[in-house]
C-alpha cells in the first residue's frame, strides 16, 4: 500500500486548497476530523487535520496498464474514512472481472471541508468546497503518478457511495475536474438537488457559524481549534445547525445545481453506472441511526411526519398493511421517494448523456450481514423485524469486509452474531466486483459469466436487480414497486 498525501491543512493552510507530498506506508493514516456521536455509523474519533492521504491497491506494475478506480467514501460529508475500504478484491477483479488499480481517498468534511463565509469569500477565491478540491487534488495526483503503480492515467473511473456519490456528481459538474476521469459510478445516492446547498444559503450558514465562534475575520476562523469547530458543528440533526450533506453551489467549483446539469446536459458526458439499495432512505435511518442522534428519541415515526401530505401518504401506505407497525411503515415511506429520485435522475442522465450509456441497478438482497447491533431487535411497538437491504449494506459486496464505523464487524440480521459474506452472497459479490471492474476498463459492465446488463433508456429501464439470483426489473416494474408516480405527484403539489 502506498500513501501519498496532501500537506496538513491547519493554521494558515486551513480554508485553502491542498498541496501534495509523498510518503510510503504499510498501514492506514489518520482519519479526518468528524463527529463521533452516531454510534456504529460513525468513524473513529479524530481531531487530526493531518489526514489528506490516499491509499493505492494494485496487483503490480507488469503487463498492460490497468484501469483505475478512484473511490470517495460516504458518510454525509461529515464523517467517514478510507480505512474501512479494503480494495484488495477489486484490485484483482475477483474471479469474474479484470485487474484494476484501486485508490481510496480522504478529504476534509463538515465545516473543515464545506464552508462559505463572507470574510473568507472577500479574499477573492472560490474555496467554499474544500472537500471537493481535496478530491480533485487526489485526481491530479493519480493522473501524474498512477502509471508507476501499473495504472492507466487516461482510463480513470471516479466512484463513490452515498456522500461519495454526491461528490462524484459534483466533480462531474465541476469545470475544475475536466479531464481527470473518464467514467462515473454513483452507488446509493440519487443525486437530486436537495443534497446541494445554494451559495446564498451557504453564506448565511457560514456567517452564522462565524458569529457562534465569535469570529469577525478570516484569521480568527483559521485559528479555531479542531475541537472547537467540531463542538460548534454538532451532530447531523436539528441540533447541529451547521451540518449539511452535500456540496456548495458556488458558481465556480460547482457551478449549478445537479438536476440543472442533468436536464440541460451541462456536465461532462461519459459512461455512467448508478443505483440504490431496496431500503435506501429508510431502513437504518428509521430503525437504527435515529437512536444515536442527540435530542428527543425518534423511535415511533409515523406517516404523520408528512404534515399536509399525510392524508395522501396514509391512503397510499395504510398502517394496517404493515401490521400496524409504524417502524416498518416508516422504512417504506422513507425508502420509496429516495428510490424514485434515483429513477428520475437516471432518466435525466440517459436523456442528455449524448453518445454514452447509463446503467441502472436496484440492489434488493435483504439478508446481508449489517453493522447496526440493534437491527435484530429493532425497537418497534409490535416487535416485528424485517431484514433490510439498507443504506450501505451493499458496500461489503464491493469492498470486502466493509463494516462501517467503529463496531468492527457485521452482524447477521436475524441472530445478531458476527459473520462475513457466505455462499450465494460471495457469488453476488463476485458478480458486482466483476461488473464494476469491467465498467472501469471499458465503460460497459458486461463480460463473460456476468449477468447481462442492458443500458438504461427513458421509460424502459431496465434495472439490473442485484440479488441471489440476479434478475431484470423493467422501468414499469420499478415504478410500481416504489410508487414513483405517487411520489412525483406529491413533489408537484408542494
Regions found by a protein language model. Give the residues of each.
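Short Gly/aromatic-enriched secondary-structure transition segments
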Residues: 1-19, 286-306, 451-456
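Alpha/beta-hydrolase-fold serine-hydrolase catalytic core, especially in secreted/extracellular enzymes
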Residues: 352, 356, 411-494
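Catalytic-loop region of hydrolases
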Residues: 1-64, 227, 232-235, 240-241, ...
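Short, solvent-exposed loop/turn elements at domain surfaces
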Residues: 3-9, 111-113, 281-284, 369-371, ...
